[in-house]
Amino acid sequence: NQIAIIGNTRTRENVIRRQLRIFPGDVYSQERIARSYREVMMLNFFANATPNILPVSEDKVDIEIAVEEKPAGQASANMGYTQSLGMTGGGGLALPNFRGKGQSFSFSFNIGTNIGGSDSYNYQNLNSNQPKYRTASISFTDPMVNDTKNLLGGSIFYRLQGGGSTAYYSPLLTTLAGGSVMWGRIFKWPDDFFRGTWSFQMARRINQGTEEDLDNYAGGMKQSDGISLTQAIRRDNRDHPEFPTIGSHFSLNSTLSGWLLGGQENFHKHTLNLEWYTPTFWKFVLTNSFKFGVIKELPSKYGGISFIPYNDRFIMGGNGIPYGNPLRGYDDNGVGPLTNSLNPIGGNTMVKIGTEFRVPFAENPVVYGILFAEMGNVWSSNDLMERLNLPRRGPMDLKRSAGAGIRFFMPMIGKLGFDIGYGFDRIDSNGELDPEWKTTLTFGQQF
């Protein structure tokens, strides 16, 4: 008969209604009510959403959906110390339900200084005490413009990184600035769990460093322009955004940079990511993941130099910051091709396989423990079969780790995570096997 929504003190009612899969006048369907509940919860705006069935007559019922709002935004913070970078830290502001309209607005910054740190390079035109890592970005996205299935978004970003020999960043001092625009759409086929986004990005990169490092990391160029198109197709039917117990998440991202679009950064890059969740006994959940990526250089359509920026290649290890490929139990960004001074130079092929056994300790707020085992690696070659017959050099040369961790999703704190992992195949600076334990920590604050 009717559908009423109560408890939405911040979120506008249309944001909730556009997620529903059952409407006034429809035949009663428990399956469609369950799907509506799932869609509302996956917004991640609510601690709970309870559909109540209220009989009206012999053949009619009303549905009342009672929601409980979560904190409106999230302020994140991180801090650490490394020998090369000294103190590192940053923060940001994310409003996933901006103005109560379901739009997302975010701003972030990060900085690393080498106070008390060391440099292997001291370029004549660089101050060795300046930050080696400084980023800022701002973005806005409307996932359902005017309650349609269309998404619109945009972002601008600035990044300065490098300037010294570190286990994290290029020895080049690189400044990157640019922006992007994005359009997306919810699909009807194969099913409405699928959606796609298409983004156009332009950025300018300015590099400073020795001639040798410019050749190794930037194709010998002090300045380059990158113009790219990216397509992202994903399917997500998980039952909960913070602690999924069933369902899967699939994404396929493809980027074309340069070539017909112009610029000096000419390549195509593809990344496949699969995650699936299986309930076992009691409330234990088995989580499996697989990630594969490949990047290949393209010739310049208009002549001139063509290259792939090293930070567009695949870099793995530790917490994965800032390249997005963590591997617990290993040095941060220390897995894959390295220079003689043990700097990551990036690879063209990446594989990662992981398994987690999760057990919930609390539901509201969400707290759960993790037992994990994972393995992965990055290679210079695009051909996984090229070195199959050589020990520790082929596609099965995966760096293995195992360990445990815990996750908290708490009001006024946000996401708090701690992992300790044992890297079975860790190699020291002398090339000798040196397995050991490594820890990682993540922190965020909600308000």
Show the residue positions of the predicted features:
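Gram-negative/organellar outer-membrane beta-barrel architecture
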Residues: 26-242, 248-251, 284, 328-329, ...
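N-terminal periplasmic "start-of-domain" segments of outer-membrane beta-barrel proteins
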Residues: 10-23
